[in-house]
Amino acid sequence: MKILVDGIRPNLFVLVETDLWPNCVDALKHRGVPAVLVNGRISPGSFARLRRLAPFLRPLYQSLDMVFAQSLEDRERYRGLGVRPECVQALGNLKFDSILKNPAASELSRLGESSGISGDRLVWIGGSTHEGEEEALLEIHTHLRERHRDLLLVLAPRRIERASQLVELCREHGCSVGRRSLGETAQGKSVYLLDTLGELSAFYHLADAAFIGGILVPFGGHNPLEAVACLKPTFWGPHLFNFREIESSLLQAGCGQKVDTYSELHTALAACLRSETIQAKMKTSAQRFLSTHTGCSRQIARQLVGRFFSA
């Protein structure tokens, strides 16, 4: 690390989240290079362990010039480990900014045309699904179509190499299916298989509701923010242990719903799809959440430039 720092001679070194390397910070300190931690977070369990080592770690944390923590709780934990109180702020989670990618209306129009999904068709999407989830989603879809005959399920598996297997599964459930990768459309189909890469976020914009996969089976889940950022009613299961803090924020804001079973998912989806009031309420909650939780990247950049790069 000393060789790297000497070779680059940085004006500022930025560490991210939990990547706090003692040797790196020590090398920076001895060369007069400011060290800043952005999007910092410390889980309660990690804090308990680190606090037992506080006498040894205090010089490390005191060496940090600035810390931008994700939450007020994280801010207090950093202070408890030795970061100078005036050097740590809680500005929010950078990940909230990273998911704001709103495609242009013309792009969404082209996507709707190429996929055959019209604006007046009721659509729900299963995003980043895993093996064991799709069969249950297809059963739910079959029941939902008893009330909404033209309802479309966009099925986006986490592993697109499972596409052929999923086509057979759809047919076993009596569902006609179109594949995105083959240039097929959703017209006349009850399921549209999104077996391509990089399009899931855009398809959330075409949906009326979204389920986030990897959560009703114990995989840890995928980030629900992507669907929430599209202002869609978003549902997930109990195993979202990879995104607990984000989950807590979303539930508190009322712009997502946690379900514990497929039966609960069916009930929640049925209520959402038949009620424009529920959809509008969750959309408003999502808008309010995004307005209060985004923008920290701009604030951090402004402070870094003002302190370390101003003339």
Enumerate the predicted regions with their spans:
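Nucleotide-activated sugar donor-binding and catalytic core shared by glycosyltransferases
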Residues: 1-311
